[in-house]
């Protein structure tokens, strides 16, 4: 379970880092803001979210990473015994919801731009479903359960 927890942590840390970079104005992996919006945001506007929105997204993406490590018993948490599985369950549900949302027509109407729509269907949503599965595996196999 350590491998799964560490993989989740590293992946979410990297994705959170990208969101921080975008908040500071970095356009990687694209050249222009419009291209970046089309690739990673997908809404109709040509403007990236504000820096604060990028930073908030980065924080929301990062937080489940240490939770995965706690679920695997790799880091100690100074919280009640029920808090970590509750947080892990919440993370699993959020990733499951985001993963499913990417395949719904209402989501596609809200985020129709290409190549985001294709990337979302092929990569972003499946990755969210994989993260949800990882959290479920960690929850089921928690040390001491």
Show where each model-derived region lies.
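Feature marks short, highly hydrophobic, charge-poor N-terminal signal-anchor/signal peptide-like helices
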Residues: 1-7, 145
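Core segments of transmembrane alpha-helices
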Residues: 51-69, 127-132
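Interfacial loop at the N-terminal end of multi-pass membrane proteins
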Residues: 18-56, 74-75, 109-115
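Individual transmembrane alpha-helices with interfacial aromatic-anchor signatures
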Residues: 84-90, 114-131
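Alpha-helical transmembrane segments of multi-pass membrane proteins
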Residues: 15, 91-98
